[in-house]
Amino acid sequence: MKQYIVLACMCLAAAAMPASLQQSSSSCTEEENKHYMGIDVIIKVTKQDQTPTNDKICQSVTEITESESDPEVESEDDSTSVEDVDPPTTYYSIIGGGLRMNFGFTKCPQIKSISESANGNAVNARLSSVPLGQGKDSPAITRAEALAMIKDCELSIDIRCSEEEKDSDIQTHPVLESNISHKKVSYEDIIGSTIVDTKCVKNLEFSVRIGDMCKESSDLEVKDGFKYVDGSVSEGVTDDTSLIDSTKLKSCV
């Protein structure tokens, strides 16, 4: 369930979801019960006018996976088990363009590509899975597992100001994107919470889309969207097909 709270210099909100691309059919399996699920997260940030300009993108990317529960649980016979363990959450911290963007993914498709662009007060980022045949393949899962992933995937976002001065660390390879179609699909609550420091962030728009990267299937594709513009919040209205100019993005990983 989406919710938001506006604080002094912070906006706490729930978020939303967007879209991706289309995979090499030659790499995809025709097996009916195999699905290669992907995720595509697109972020558009407009910084406050007084914020210093910083066009250094991809200054650093950090990935950490952790679980909130202790995996060792005492049983009645004094032995230990691994039951009741919360699913791990993978966090990505991206520093660039005068911002630190932190993303948390729980029970979601794997992120394999991270890219960023900056021009003046505009900072854009994209995190996505990668289609088959790109050397970073996601594992195939069953239809039941894919439906559960759509239902359970949760994304959190935390965007803060950054004064990092290190140089950009842009990768030379092209930006890899997922292969999810851009057709109209139903909305799903995928975002947990979004924290935005309004000291440096004026507007925020982002979208998320989850879908099969090999097969177009309406019941295996969902999206969500969120806007925070001039102090007003809108949910589920972001057009992920035109949110940013993807040709300007540079690979961070």
Swiss-Prot record:
Stretch forming the signal peptide: 1-17
Family of this protein: Belongs to the orthopoxvirus OPG001 family.
Keywords attached to this entry: Early protein, Host-virus interaction, Inhibition of host chemokines by virus, Secreted, Signal, Viral immunoevasion
Residue segments, region Disordered: 62-87
Protein name as catalogued: Chemokine-binding protein
The organism of origin for this protein: Variola virus (isolate Human/India/Ind3/1967)
InterPro entries per UniProt: Chemkine-bd_vir, Orthopox_35kDa, Pox_vCCI-like_sf
Amino acid composition bias (Acidic residues), ranges on this chain: 65-86
GO cellular component: extracellular region
Induction summary: Expressed in the early phase of the viral replicative cycle.
Domain of life: Viruses
Keyword Nuclease: no
